[in-house]
């Protein structure tokens, strides 16, 4: 489920994170395309937009999330520094979290959320035991992002 912070008007938070909330299925793969335009003009009528494909799948002991490189159409130029925040609802805590085959560092919740709209070179994750939710912070990239949760 794509989300964003609550704002009083379009563009209030220039570098607001893109939030994706996952309720993964153990039996079905899922995917969707996030469509974005500038939110202010009629440029979308001229096919000026950005699309980002997101996929997730489960295997017996891993969950895989792929955020594909955003694809611009019609000269869409807005590729600002922003972060992705993934909120993944899980039955159990993963033992390892990987980003493009590299182990991510565990963070403190306050640090992760404080950096969400100001730091664009930080990656990390935190698991909330109370609501069984894994939060992963990643900078938006011009490459595919492969997230692997191992159990």
Feature map (PLM): residue ranges:
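Short beta-strand element of the conserved SAM-dependent methyltransferase core
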Residues: 54, 125, 148-150
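Generic structural detector for well-ordered beta-strands
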Residues: 87, 135-137, 148
